[in-house]
Amino acid sequence: LMKAEGKFVVGMVAANKASGMVHRKAFSEIIMAFSIFHKKHPDAILYLHTDPLGRSGGWNIPSLLGSLSIPQEAVCFPDPNDYRFGLAHSDLAAFYTSFDVLLATSYGEGFGVPTMEAQACGTRVIGSNWAATPDLVSEDSWLVDGTPAWDSGQNAWWQTPNIPSIVNALELAYAEDRGKSQVAIDFAKDFDVETVWKKYWLPTLGKLLT
């Protein structure tokens, strides 16, 4: 990302792994959507904070990129050691701040920590209009619809994100002013640990203990 000045940076922070045949983070859909978007906007860069080789049963991302003829210079990955051993909070925040938008259109989330981390840094989100995500994005973010997909392992429905809808959301994000979103920052503050503790946990514990 050091060479990303003047570029439109699309970020994704997700584990590249699968449960059986289910790749919940939707890497293939997201990468195809980016390939379509990049043809119109060659100034776009995709940063994937993940293991590119999918050593936990995920995709071989370089193969995915090659199948879609995405130029190597249009995609960035973290340093392998940094990814394996973790980054300092300040370094991770610097990555989030460098994004113009976070792509988080997974099949479903129970919470989706990167979604909230990105917004705390002022970065808006493109998320799935499914499961917990609609409750976890600010009003100036974007939600993507898709096709319901049955997951027998969890006995529940997920959603496969619609690729043209992801492309459209990227176009909307590209058309917006660049820079931090104060709306996203203010929204994320409601999920700060001290706020959640005082606003929700203390009253709940008080009721349970009376």
Feature-to-residue mapping (PLM):
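A short alpha->beta transition loop at the rim of the catalytic pocket in nucleotide-sugar-dependent
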Residues: D100, A120-G122, N129
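A charged, aromatic-enriched C-terminal amphipathic alpha-helix characteristic of glycosyltransferases
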Residues: P161, S165, A175-L205
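Nucleotide-activated donor-binding/catalytic signature segment of Leloir-type glycosyltransferases, i.e.
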Residues: G58-A94
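Aromatic "clamp/platform" in nucleotide-sugar-dependent glycosyltransferases that forms part
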Residues: Y107
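Short hydrophobic beta-strand element within catalytic cores of glycosyltransferases
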Residues: T115, R124-G127, V137, W142-L143
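Conserved donor-binding/catalytic core segment of Leloir-type glycosyltransferases
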Residues: M2-K25, I31-F34, H38, Y47-L48
